[in-house]
C-alpha cells in the first residue's frame, strides 16, 4: 500500500449510472458497460468507478455510482442504446492510494486512505473520488488506485 499526491489533468470518460448497494450495482454496471463496449468494438484504456454517496449516510438502495471507461482520444462511438454518457472528470490535487483489496474489503481500503490523508496534512475536498482498476479481479484480489480530491488542512504547508 502506497500513498502519493498527484496533480491530475481533466479526463474524459464514458460512464453509466448505477443505483443500489455498491457491492451489487457496480459489478452489474460493469458487466453491462463492458458488453456494450465489446459490441461497439471500443478500445478502452482504463476502467473507473465513481462514488457519489457515503454508505454511512445514504440508504443502500439509493447509493449512486458511475462505472466508466476511458477511451483513446478521438474514438468514435456508434449507437448508444445503453444510456452511456460522456463526462469530464475535473483535474486537480488528488491523494492516490495504490493497494491490493482482498476478500472484497474495499471499505477497509477507503478507510485507510482517509486516515493517511489526515496524517499527511490534507483533508478530502468536496470534489470527486473514484477507484481505478489495475486488474480484472479474477484472482479474487483487486489491484486498485483510489483517487480522492484533497485540499491542504488549515495550517498545513
From Swiss-Prot:
Cellular localisation: Cytoplasm
Pfam families: GyrI-like
Gene Ontology cellular-component annotations: cytoplasm
Keywords for this protein: Cytoplasm, Stress response
GO terms assigned for molecular function: DNA topoisomerase type II (double strand cut, ATP-hydrolyzing) inhibitor activity
PANTHER family in the cross-refs: DNA GYRASE INHIBITOR (PTHR40055:SF2), TRANSCRIPTIONAL REGULATOR YGIV-RELATED (PTHR40055)
Family to which the UniProt record says this protein belongs: Belongs to the DNA gyrase inhibitor family.
SUPFAM superfamilies registered for this protein in UniProt: Probable bacterial effector-binding domain
Assembly and binders: Interacts with DNA gyrase.
Main location group: cytoplasm
Identification of the protein by name: DNA gyrase inhibitor 2
Gene that this polypeptide is encoded by: sbmC2
InterPro entries: AraC_E-bd, DNA_gyrase_inhibitor, DNA_gyrase_inhibitor_GyrI, GyrI-like, Reg_factor_effector_dom_sf
Function: Inhibits the supercoiling activity of DNA gyrase. Acts by inhibiting DNA gyrase at an early step, prior to (or at the step of) binding of DNA by the gyrase. It protects cells against toxins that target DNA gyrase, by inhibiting activity of these toxins and reducing the formation of lethal double-strand breaks in the cell.
